[in-house]
Amino acid sequence: MSKLVRPHGGGELKPLLLTGDALSAEKARAASLPQLKMSSRETGDLIMMGIGGFTPLDGFMTKSDWQGVCDGYKMTNGLFWPIPITLSTDDESIKDGDELALVDAETGEIMGTMKVTDKYTIDKAHECMQVYKTTDMEHPGVKMVMAQGKYNLAGPVKVLSTGNFKEEYGEQFMTPAETRAKFEQMGWSRVAAFQTRNPMHRSHEYLAKIAIETMDGVLVHSLLGALKPGDIPAEVRSEAIATLIDNYFAPNTVIQAGYPLDMRYAGPREALLHALFRQNYGCSHLIVGRDHAGVGDYYGPFDAQKIFDEIPKGSLETVNMNIDWTFWCKKCGGMASQRTCPHTKDDRILLSGTKVRAMLSEGQDLPVEFSRPEVAKVLQKYYAGLSAEQNVKVELKGHSAA
């Protein structure tokens, strides 16, 4: 009997990726079906369904699911879900009952098939207000929703591919079944997920080590899908994180892995989604720091912590591990948090993303109190290869790694 948290919904993992003869047969059938091009976000969502990360979904959401999730975190069947998982199109001719091949618009690869059970329109501004708390087109998540097609399509899917994530990231691209097997092998049952879309600096290292003190282990779980233009690419982040783990974490306390979603930058709602799919990966806790999954000033620094107290009790088995803002304090002589350090901001070493970017692009060393030298070297190498124009666009934001 597994001691790990159960997958979301309380049943078994439900990966929708076909294998063997079923995969060969469906691929052959898909080749003759009308094609629907998916955005990067939609492709990532489909792959998550394929590997079981979005258990127990069996496809893209219906209008009543969309409405229920937007307005009350609940699908029609009563399942807790914090963000709509939808597929859109501008194609007027598609109708209920149609069978479609789902194609990654960027690569042209057929990623899955779908039987359309519902074609509907939505109030995009309503989704933005409910999920992102704003309709400001400067918000990358709002921009993404507003760029969707005129219609949403719902229906069960069969997944045929996970794209090139395995080829690009090798063992780091782990499915929920694989992380669960690894946790079992390690004898772990209390596992904290550390969500990251950035390289890990000293403050992130400190957060993970706080969790290690009370947990069996930590899953450092990096986003491998698309970010905002200018964010550091996943392969560079992965190398920087691996370098930190190899040099500064005790053996058998951390597993590094990645997942295929794009960032939505939905702040509190995205923190709930992060906890939900970490439950499928086998994690009992999600570390939630300052400004988790946020962007700009759209959310309060700890809104993503507060939202866990606002959802119905028992919605998720994976629970939040709240940790305050962390930094190096000169007077304390080490890493500290707002909760433990009595000193003023003048005693704290805080670097803005702009400052970090400027130092790295000029080949300067970052303060050792801010970043480990081995990590800084990985980033310096990346920045050295950028043109001046690219350099301006690269962003390192927020004190949270999320």
Curated annotation (Swiss-Prot):
UniProt-listed NCBIfam families: PRK04149.1, sopT
Stated name of the protein: Sulfate adenylyltransferase
Disulfide cysteine pairs (residue numbers): none
Signal peptide region: none
Source domain of life: Bacteria
SUPFAM superfamilies documented for this protein: Nucleotidylyl transferase, PUA domain-like
The reaction(s) this protein catalyses: sulfate + ATP + H(+) = adenosine 5'-phosphosulfate + diphosphate
EC number(s) recorded for this UniProt protein: 2.7.7.4
Record-stated family: Belongs to the sulfate adenylyltransferase family.
Keyword Metal-binding attached: no
Gene: sat
Statement: the UniProt record of this protein carries the keyword Nucleotide-binding: yes
GO molecular function terms listed in the Swiss-Prot or TrEMBL record: ATP binding; sulfate adenylyltransferase (ATP) activity
Keywords: ATP-binding, Nucleotide-binding, Nucleotidyltransferase, Transferase
Pfam families xref list: ATP-sulfurylase, PUA_2
Pathway annotation: Sulfur metabolism; hydrogen sulfide biosynthesis; sulfite from sulfate: step 1/3
GO aspect biological process, one term: hydrogen sulfide biosynthetic process
Provenance organism: Thiobacillus denitrificans (strain ATCC 25259 / T1)
